[in-house]
């Protein structure tokens, strides 16, 4: 009896029919394709894109040169140099992020005690040569200034989960 069952399964191509059933189900299902440049999918407030350095409302940069982000970066993509000010506080003289090395894990953002470094929703950036994707302090501050309103909204939406 078992031999007959096995023969019928192989003769009727039972596995092939099961596969065709799955194919047919997805063939007539609604499509989920997004035509990227014209259409964009919604992004989460927690999206980790291009980095930015933030400023306080009075215009002073937030980074206190504690170097926690540099220490926690698993890809060693962050380079920080700092100096002591006359009033005894430390400030960065150099803050570079190599986006080629960066794995966008968000550890730098979590480690920062003053929310100076954040990851924005900016997904589209490019460079023509390798050095174009090393963002300096000035470039990161410019990104932060440009997207501060969106960053503040995302931080407020994420606040209950922090």
From Swiss-Prot:
Q: Which cofactor does it need?
A: [4Fe-4S] cluster
Annotated [4Fe-4S] cluster 2 binding lies at 73, 102, 105, 108
Q: Which reaction(s) are listed as its catalytic activity?
A: a quinone + NADH + 5 H(+)(in) = a quinol + NAD(+) + 4 H(+)(out)
Enzyme nomenclature, EC number: 7.1.1.-
4Fe-4S ferredoxin-type domain spans which residues? 53-83, 93-122
- InterPro entries of this UniProt entry? 4Fe4S_Fe-S-bd (IPR017896), 4Fe4S_Fe_S_CS (IPR017900), NADH_quinone_OxRdtase_chainI (IPR010226)
Recorded hits in NCBIfam families, A to Z, give:
NuoI, PRK05888.1-4, PRK05888.1-5
The protein, known as: NADH-quinone oxidoreductase subunit I
Origin organism of this chain? Answer: Nitrosomonas eutropha (strain DSM 101675 / C91 / Nm57)
The UniProt gene name for this protein comes to nuoI
